[in-house]
Amino acid sequence: MSSQMTFSDEQTMLLDTATEFCRKHSPIETVRARLDADQIDATTWKEITDLGWLGINVPEEFGGLGLGLSCVVPVAESMGRYLMGTPYNGAITASECLATSGSREQKEEWLPKIVSGAIGAMALIETNGSWILDQIEAQAIASEDMFELSGTKCFVTDADAADFYIVSVNVEAKARLALVKREQIPEGNLHREIVIDETRRSYQLDLDGIMVPVDQLLEGSDFQAIEFASLLLLSAEITGGLVGSIHTIVEYLNTRRAFDKVIGSYQALKHPTVKILLDLEASRSHLYHAATVLADDNAGEAEIALRMAKAHGSAAFAFAGDRAVQFHGGFGFTYDCDAQLYLRRALWCQYQFGDEAYHRQLLEPILLD
């Protein structure tokens, strides 16, 4: 087992750069202003592309930096810290999926496009909320040299801005991945969803009647790579969200006064705040340990580390968001209080790819056998 957690020079540089970028481009006023936006911020997305962040994990032969997923973590963490709503995590997961499951031709066509700003969206979740392979309901039926798709996918973030989608489907009772281009989606097949996290632009994708060529099925079906990438990016976003939550809490506790004292001086508020800080440090340790072992290419260790990171982070962020609302008193329950934005993000992240109970249940046989 890997005994040393590393934090590379590249990660340090990316964390500093990404933190400053997100602080500048996603202050809370901008976050609020974009809650009802019907499009992504194209200017910010272009800047993200120009910084090379979409190519961090893409192999150099396809125009990327070849630094691996571990170096994506600081960027995703910074975006979580400032509640930045971009298609970044979906694009990174899509590129990771293509890198591990795509054919040579698919990689050569799409990976350079992603590096240059093309947006990929992951369409994996069924209407029952499941992404698990043996519960895939979407179908791909062969018809000569085409496949006809059917079914519905939910929680496809930034689907309206995507250039392509990675869709999980059943092909002759076997779970496969298909790449669907934006122009293959008929008008009216995307429906905006109302979700708890209003910084997200989430859509339902109707697959009925969509025809795709056989060569748009991915060569492989490495669902583990998708799950690992998703868990790592979610854990990074959660860790960043914890930072944002505790900053919101501490700022208010040092400002609001009651009985001629700042309320942060009262023990009943100090102790939960300290717990959140300890949870943050533990979450960050879990996160960067998971990034380290994933880079070591040890699937067994990586699964343990990633599930531990997601389980701990999910519970910690939900608690921090809840306390942030509670500490603001009656104002905390109003729409004008910024604390509720962190709670909403926490609840969204908590149930994406499994909450803490789900991952602890999967960890039990691995750790106890």
Q: Which residue stretches match the model-derived regions?
A:
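Short glycine/proline-enriched turns and hinge-like loops at secondary-structure junctions
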Residues: 67, 132-134, 158-162
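Flexible, small-/acidic-enriched active-site or ligand-binding loops
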Residues: 135-137, 155-156, 182-214, 219-222
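N-terminal glycine-rich flavin-associated loop
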Residues: 84-105
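Cytochrome P450 C-terminal beta-domain/meander region
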Residues: 132-150
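A short core secondary-structure module
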Residues: 150-188
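Alpha-helical interface subdomain recognition
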Residues: 1-82, 104, 113, 117, ...
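A short, Trp-centered hydrophobic/proline-enriched beta-strand micro-motif
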Residues: 116-126
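Short beta-strand-to-turn element immediately C-terminal to the catalytic PLP-Schiff-base lysine
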Residues: 99-102, 141, 167-170, 179-182, ...
